[in-house]
Amino acid sequence: MTQQAYEALLNDVAAALDIERVETDKSGGFVLELDGSRWVSVAYSTPEDKLMCQLCLEATLSPDAETLRYLLRQNQFIAEYEQQHFFSLIPDIQQHNNIVVALLRLPVHNMTPKIFLQEVDRMVSRGTAVESWLLQLKEQKEAAPAAIEQAALKA
């Protein structure tokens, strides 16, 4: 994705999320103005950071969760998130969009997969409706191997 296309995508996302302004920063990344006083960085200094930003932005514009899963599978770095967490379990568009908004509000600058997942865990522990739903998905995903093992023992 070219810098110009990336900036156009960010502006589309900004309009969709009622973000007031998008600006380029010194690092070549971007910051989003949410309410005139609070800025959220989507700057990146590594290819991984850039991919995380791009995932959030593309997912926001995706028509459904299946598209998000497709995007996740296109890149090995991002696929690690799917394997470790909740992306493959997103059931509908509204929950999907709520999660993407939450992800966009994370400062992804210099985040490794481990740090990103720790930050998601911290969000989940605060207990809002979307975050509680994420926790439920995480628990379901963690319980899945045990359920498969039990089913295999019964067979």
Features from the language model and the residues they span:
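Charge-rich, low-complexity N-terminal segments
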Residues: M1-S41, Q84, D92
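Charged, low-complexity, helix/coiled-coil-prone segments
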Residues: E7-V22, L55-R73, A147
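Hydrophobic residues embedded in beta-strands of well-ordered beta-sheets
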Residues: F30, D49-L51, N98-V100
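A generic beta-sheet turn/junction motif
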Residues: L34-D35, T46-E48, Q95
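A short acidic-to-branched-hydrophobic micro-motif
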Residues: V40-L61
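Short, internal acidic amphipathic alpha-helical interface segments
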Residues: L55-I99, L103
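Ampiphathic alpha-helical segments that act as solvent-exposed interaction surfaces
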Residues: Y70-A79, R105-E139
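Short, highly charged C-terminal tails/helix-capping segments
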Residues: L135-A155
